[in-house]
Amino acid sequence: MKQLISRRSFMKAAGVTTAVAAVSLGAPAASACFPGSVKDITILYTNDVHTYIDKKSPELTYAAIAALKKSYQDAGKDVLLVDAGDHIQGTAYGSMDEGASIIQLMNAAGYDVATPGNHEFDYGMARAKEAMAEADFPYLSSNWVNLPLGNRVLPDVKYFTIGGRVIAFVGITTPETFTKSTPAYFMDKSQSRYIYDILG
């Protein structure tokens, strides 16, 4: 019960973590650009859902999350829905189709942005990239890199103009992903060298 209350509190209190940081960029400048139109912004946040989507926790289903977001929108509120990772793995719901159904549910719920957690890599590198491509929302990571190419695998930041402000979400994948997942997934097919890394 303690865990359920904690997650519910995070949802309603619009918390953010270091994995997905919400920053108001240049608030005075934004106010000048949108005089008289600066409003409160609600950020709904989930993480470590681990495919627990059954009715044992009805207030935490994706249908409930979608309804919560819609309730803010229907009230004329500015709202964004974000996830900080570890959502496609954890129960049989995820393993049956390697997270495809979870991504579909997140699409239907109206997520705006997400960052990959260490468990997004549990089905292998190819599936991790494929699952993220199935999302209608962008995934962000400033420190997941392709070593041979010397660039990021995903965008590092997403900007939203909302509530009279410019809001930036910066994605950071936990560096422990490299060891908490399967290191071989970050190597080439011959497992002779690493081609991906999560920089710390």
Residue ranges and their predicted role:
Residues K2-G15, A19, S31-G200:
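Acidic, metal/ion-coordinating pockets
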